Amino acid sequence: MTHRQNFASLSSGTDYEQLANRFRPIFERIAEGAIKRERTRTLPHEPIEWLKKAGFGAVRVPVESGGAGASLPQLVQLLIELAAADSNVPQALRGHFAFVEDRLNAQPGPQRDIWFKRFVAGETFGNAWTEVGEVKIGDVITQVSPKDGRWALNGHKYYSTGSIFADWIDVYARRADNGADVIAAVHTAQPGVTLHDDWDGFGQRTTGSGTSIFTDAVVEADDVFDFSTRFKYQTAFYQLVHLATLAGIARAAERDVAQQVAGRKRIFSTGNAPLA
């Protein structure tokens, strides 16, 4: 059996309505505070915690490993519903679901099982790939170096979407010993990781897309992955999450406009009724 066939047998789908009904009450709670969070730029720590505790981050994990076994189309449907409640939240979780997808594509074995257990336990990922400053296009300055049987990670990243909410960060780096590009899975609860809420962009106001600083951050030996093994459809996956978010925004806009129009008393511009 090939690796691709192994993957095809994982998380092929479940009953969508039953799955979605697990999370819809949480989506409703998230929607209640979405406008206020956007206006006051309040990061959605609590809504993301609700989702983590409910197992939302493990919906793609196979049922036999404790997850929901959702297919990729079903994940997209859930993200659309979530985006209709608060579009910042699925964007903040985009890096998490990408890392889950990568582990789904990994070779079966104990290491993959460890990650599945972490996802089921509610642990989530942010991402830190982008660098600013003197870095050249296509290059990376952040490095991992062998140290005492582990790795030491050093570098600065920007646009670290979701990392401020996460237990782990998916960091794009380069090995100092041989120059190979790698992905380092870095635990955030350590002195060597500093996360700043300094995102000042026009959009994504509450996605936690600020600066991540790594200063001799400890990375376990098994948590550095050669970039050549990254799941091959990752670019399409990232764009798919964006499209799901946009679809949710459109759904919310349709809902809100319909509510406004339905509540109007004056329906014709030259009507003789008082203005509503």
Question: What do these predicted ranges mean?
Answer:
Residues L78, L153-G155, A184, F214, ...:
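Buried hydrophobic positions in well-ordered alpha/beta secondary-structure cores of metabolic enzymes
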Residues Y158-S163, Y238-H242:
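Glycine-rich phosphate/pyrophosphate-binding beta-alpha loops
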Residues Y159-T194:
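A short core secondary-structure module
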Residues G201-A276:
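Glycine-rich beta->alpha junctions and the first turn(s) of the following alpha-helix
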Residues T2-R60, A68-Q77, A244-A276:
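Alpha-helical interface subdomain recognition
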Residues W129-E131, G155-H156, R174, V186-A189, ...:
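Fold-independent oxyanion-binding glycine-rich loops
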Residues E123, G138-V140, F165-D167, A180, ...:
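A generic structural signal for well-ordered coil/turn residues at beta-strand boundaries
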Residues H45-K53, A58-H156, T161:
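Glycine-rich flavin
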